[in-house]
Every structure is written in structure tokens, then in C-alpha cells.
């Protein structure tokens, strides 16, 4: 019966130029349930929630609240109906205080005067009630990412929202913060609030959701009760085939030192402090060393220094016995360094180039692709076609496809094909599976392990602890620019890593 559902999205269709992001999708949310929305990258999850929150208008379909059809033209309409949303990328004003962010747009006033004391009282009461402790006077720019998420949740609660949308809420949290968020969601559920939870993490769905709706390529695949399903079944619904969720790999056989990093320090002019502090470690041939940590703790800057995108303030980098501290990016590439960058659009691809031109970005100047100073298009096409076939890169027009038109997963496959085919001595893979579906993740993990088994030294930088534990032979944790601990994945736990990632421990000692 319709009255069983607090929200119904019936036969929703939303189109963008050239793509049907939502194709006749129905989603029904019960009062007091946690309902997960699962799908691969580009399946239409965020689009569907943006329709519910009033950011997009659908071409077809209707939305009902408590059985009555409603029109949601913008986020103000959504808020008026008790619908709130925590976006994947937080919508906070960094130079405002926590309190100012929470009340922004709904400031209480009397006779035209802001009643901040009244607002503070309500915020602190909500903070206490739900265990979302925050400092209302702290600037958002000075608080952690986990704390910023609490501010976003309090923004919803301050507006008395009863239907709460969380878009990939755990992407930037430590394991402990993820556990806290799950408890907060369970608390909301007990209160009778209804939660829509967008995620691609099957463990979290199994832990907290009551039901799960699965989307694939913009279409509705079905809704299942979590108590009656498995992770394997959900992944099969999501990608249309069986997926290997665990990485199968033999124990590492480390060889000679390939990467030697000694006392590397980098300075951030923006923050006016050191972003990387005296980092020293080695990576051997035939092993995967993972640099783990919460986003914003110096990993990005360190990789920039390692790959030549930024200069070091101090320290030395040696690649296979050769000092490359001051080498150019091209020289590092010639010396055997391959780099799968964190931001595939900014540093990995030229989006308006064809796929074949992107495939030779690291090689176009080599003799095999040149004749008399001109690039040989036939050789470029031949090389690109081979990589496309070998690495299963799917695109509309093959080698001539403009890269911008390709899916995120296939863009990433193209980068991996280009970087691995160069037969590197060192492969630096930075968040190689970020934003990808389980099928693409499975493929990329297999490629990284295969490189290790060929004798390549692999430095993996990842925020995903499941990925870290699955792939790494050794784990280094970075906190505030320092390596604060080294671990063997066989003898550590996600919880222990989380303590080091949050700065609670350093080199085996408790910190304050």
C-alpha cells in the first residue's frame, strides 16, 4: 500500500544530452528504514537522488510523499518536505564557523535581528542528542574531514529533516569514523527517520541497511532485503556477472631495492608549513608497498615530489640506483617510472584528444612513432589498437574515440594500459580504483598484482582500507606528512590502521 512508504519515486526518467541517466526507475522508502542505493560508476545513483533533492527535474515519472504526489522544483522545496542531503563533496563555507554553516539560509531572527544564541542552543541540543559533538565556534577550514561531515549532518537535523540522503558518506572517513557514522544512522532509524544511503561498499550495506535497490546503466535491477541476500548476489546484480571480491595473490618475493626515498621534506606555500616531513622508506622489486592515510595528510604532495610535478625542499630520491631527485618528468619516465595519477582528468589524460593520442603521450617522441620529425599515425593507431584489445578498453569508436566521451572505468583502463605496457621498474598507482565499480576494481587489482609478480616495484597510494589490506605486502601510514607506522597486512587490523591514520598512535606510541 502507498501509505506504507514515506517516499515513492515512480518511473523516474532523467536524460542528459546523449545519455539516459535514469530510465524508468522506481524507488520506495519506508519510514524508519536504512535503504541503500547500489550501482557501479555512472549507474545513475547520484542523479536519482539529485532528482529527489530538487537539483534536477525528471523528464518523466512522479514523486510521492506519504502517498500524495509532490513537486520538488529545488532544494528549498525538498527541505520544506523534510528531505535533507549530505553530498559526497561537502557544501560548506570554509571561512565561516561551524554554527554559521549549520544555520546558513535558515537563520532565526526577531524583528530583523539574528538570534544566534537561540540557534546555538538548538545546535548544541542536537549535537548532544545524536552524539555529533562539534565546536560551534571553530572555522570549517580548521576542522577534520570527519568533523565537517558531522556539520553537514547537523545542517539536516537543524532543518528538522526526516528523510536523510547520504551520498557516498564514508569515502573520506577513518574506520573508527565509519563505525561512528553507522551508529548514528542506527540512532536515526530508531527515531523513525528514513535514510537513503548511496554507496558502492558492500560491507557497509550488509552492516547497516535494511533493504537495497540496485541500479545498472541507468536501469532498475531490483530491490532486495539485506537479511535475504549476500555480497556476491549484490555484486552480481550490480555488474551482471560473478565478481571476485577477494584478490588472489601469492606471497611476495622481494628483490633488490628499486625506489629509495631518504629524508624527503616538502613545503606548502599555501599552508605555510611542511606538507611532507622527513619521509624515508624503500620499495623492492616484486612487492607492493601501500601508503595509507586519510585524504589531506601529505600523500598527494609526496607523490608530486616523487614524480617530478613539484620540487623537494630536502631529501633524496633514487630509482634503481640512479639519483632522480632533480630529474625532469620525462627523464623519470625514461628511467622506468610509471604513474597512474590520483586525478585522471588533470594529470592522466588530455580529455579532448583521441584515445590513440592519449596512449602515446609517454612515447610519441620515440623512433618507432616518428619518421623525418613527423609522427607516424599508422604506428600510433597500430599501438593503440593493440592496447585496447589487450586491456579491454571499451569505447564507441575505438582508437579514434575522444577520451572525454568514455566512462570513468574505461578512462582508467586506458591509463593503466599505457603505464603498464611501458614495462616499468617502478609503478606508482594513486587511488587507482577511486569512483569505479566492482567489475573495474577487480580488473585493476589483477593488473597491479600481475605487475608485482613480473618483478615490478609497486607503490600504491590508497584511501580504501579494504584495497590496502587486499593488495599490500607492506603498509606505511602517513599522518600530517609523516610516516607514523609500518605494518604487515597479515598481522594488523583495519582498526589498528585507523588509529594511526587518525593520529592517535605514532610508531607504536599513544599520542594525545
Give the ranges of each region predicted by the language model.
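Glycine-rich phosphate-binding loops of nucleotide-dependent enzymes
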Residues: 2-512
Amino acid at each position: 500500500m502507498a501509505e506504507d512508504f514515506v517516499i515513492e519515486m515512480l518511473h523516474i526518467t532523467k536524460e542528459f544530452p546523449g545519455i539516459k541517466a535514469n530510465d524508468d526507475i522506481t524507488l520506495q522508502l519506508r519510514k524508519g528504514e536504512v535503504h541503500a542505493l547500489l550501482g557501479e560508476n555512472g549507474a545513475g545513483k547520484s542523479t536519482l537522488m539529485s532528482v529527489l533533492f530538487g537539483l534536477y527535474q525528471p523528464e518523466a515519472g512522479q514523486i510521492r510523499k506519504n502517498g500524495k504526489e509532490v513537486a520538488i522544483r529545488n532544494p528549498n522545496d525538498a527541505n520544506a518536505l523534510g528531505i535533507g542531503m549530505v553530498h559526497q563533496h561537502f557544501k560548506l563555507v570554509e571561512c565561516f564557523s561551524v554554527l554559521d554553516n549549520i544555520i546558513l539560509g535558515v537563520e532565526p531572527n526577531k524583528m530583523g535581528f539574528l538570534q544566534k544564541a537561540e540557534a546555538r542552543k538548538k545546535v548544541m541540543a542536537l549535537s548532544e542528542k545524536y552524539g555529533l559533538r562539534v565546536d560551534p565556534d571553530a572555522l570549517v577550514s580548521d576542522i577534520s574531514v570527519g568533523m565537517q561531515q558531522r556539520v553537514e549532518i547537523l545542517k539536516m537535523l537543524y532543518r528538522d529533516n526526516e528523510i536523510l540522503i547520504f551520498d557516498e558518506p564514508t569515502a573520506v572517513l577513518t574506520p573508527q569514523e565509519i563505525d561512528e557514522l553507522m551508529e548514528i544512522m542506527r540512532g536515526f532509524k530508531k527515531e523513525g527517520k528514513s535514510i537513503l544511503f548511496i554507496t558502492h561498499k558492500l560491507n557497509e550495506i550488509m552492516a547497516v541497511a535494511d533493504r537495497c535497490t540496485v541500479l545498472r546503466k541507468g536501469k532498475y535491477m531490483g530491490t532486495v532485503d539485506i537479511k535475504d541476500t549476500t555480497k556476491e548476489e549484490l555484486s552480481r546484480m550490480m555488474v551482471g556477472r560473478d565478481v571476485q571480491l577477494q584478490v588472489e595473490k601469492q606471497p611476495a618475493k622481494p628483490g633488490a631495492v628499486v625506489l629509495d626515498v631518504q629524508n624527503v621534506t616538502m613545503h606548502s606555500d599555501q599552508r605555510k608549513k611542511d606538507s611532507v616531513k622527513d619521509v624515508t622508506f624503500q620499495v623492492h622489486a616484486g612487492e607492493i608497498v601501500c601508503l595509507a592515510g586519510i585524504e589531506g595528510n601529505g600523500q598527494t604532495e609526496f607523490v608530486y615530489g616523487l614524480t617530478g610535478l613539484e620540487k623537494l625542499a630536502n631529501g633524496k630520491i633514487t630509482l634503481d640506483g640512479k639519483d632522480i631527485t632533480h630529474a625532469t618528468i620525462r627523464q623519470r619516465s625514461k628511467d622506468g617510472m610509471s604513474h597512474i595519477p590520483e586525478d585522471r582528468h588533470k594529470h592522466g589524460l588530455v580529455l579532448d584528444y583521441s584515445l590513440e593520442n592519449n596512449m602515446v603521450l609517454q612515447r610519441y617522441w620515440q623512433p618507432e612513432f616518428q619518421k623525418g620529425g613527423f609522427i607516424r599515425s599508422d604506428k600510433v593507431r597500430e599501438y593503440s589498437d593493440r592496447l585496447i584489445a589487450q586491456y579491454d578498453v571499451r569505447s564507441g569508436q575505438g582508437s579514434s574515440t575522444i577520451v572525454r566521451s568514455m566512462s570513468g572505468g574505461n578512462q582508467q583502463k586506458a591509463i593503466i594500459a599505457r603505464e603498464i605496457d611501458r614495462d616499468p621498474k617502478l609503478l606508482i598507482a594513486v587511488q587507482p580504483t577511486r569512483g569505479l565499480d566492482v567489475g573495474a576494481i577487480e580488473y585493476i587489482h589483477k593488473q597491479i598484482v600481475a605487475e608485482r609478480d613480473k618483478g615490478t616495484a609497486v607503490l600504491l597510494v590508497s584511501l580504501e582500507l579494504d584495497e590496502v589490506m587486499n593488495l599490500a605486502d607492506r603498509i606505511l601510514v602517513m599522518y600530517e606528512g609523516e610516516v607514523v607506522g609500518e605494518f604487515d597486512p597479515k598481522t594488523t587490523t583495519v582498526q589498528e590502521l585507523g588509529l594511526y591514520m587518525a593520529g592517535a598512535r605514532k610508531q607504536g606510541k599513544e599520542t594525545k
